[in-house]
From Swiss-Prot:
Name of this chain's protein: Brevinin-2Ee
Pfam families: Antimicrobial_2
Reported function: Shows antibacterial activity against representative Gram-negative and Gram-positive bacterial species, and hemolytic activity.
Source domain of life: Eukaryota
Predominant localisation class: secreted
GO cellular component, one term: extracellular region
Keywords, comma-separated and alphabetical: Amphibian defense peptide, Antibiotic, Antimicrobial, Cytolysis, Disulfide bond, Hemolysis, Secreted
Amino acid sequence: GIFDKLKNFAKGVAQSLLNKASCKLSGQC
């Protein structure tokens, strides 16, 4: 359903934001 799509989209966005943040913190960008 649409809610599943939204949930998956939000999960993907959160994941990429986390990846960017941890990459900046560890200085491995």
